[in-house]
Amino acid sequence: SKVIGIDLGTTNSXVAVMEG
């Protein structure tokens, strides 16, 4: 999830970390 969030963008990165 973290990698996906970072790949999409900084904003989504935070969401990915929360989901992960």
Curated annotation (Swiss-Prot):
Q: What taxonomic classification does the UniProt entry list for its organism?
A: Bacteria, Bacillati, Bacillota, Clostridia, Eubacteriales
What this protein is called in its record is Chaperone protein DnaK
> Gene3D superfamilies given for it?
3.30.420.40
Q: Looking at the keywords, is Zinc-finger present?
A: no
Induction text = By stress conditions e.g. heat shock.
Give the function comment from the record.
Acts as a chaperone.
**Organism annotation:** Clostridium pasteurianum
Q: Which family does it belong to?
A: Belongs to the heat shock protein 70 family.
Q: Which Pfam families match?
A: HSP70
A GO MF annotation of the entry reads: ATP binding
Which keywords appear in this protein's UniProt record, sorted alphabetically?
ATP-binding, Chaperone, Nucleotide-binding, Stress response
Top-level division of the source organism's lineage = Bacteria
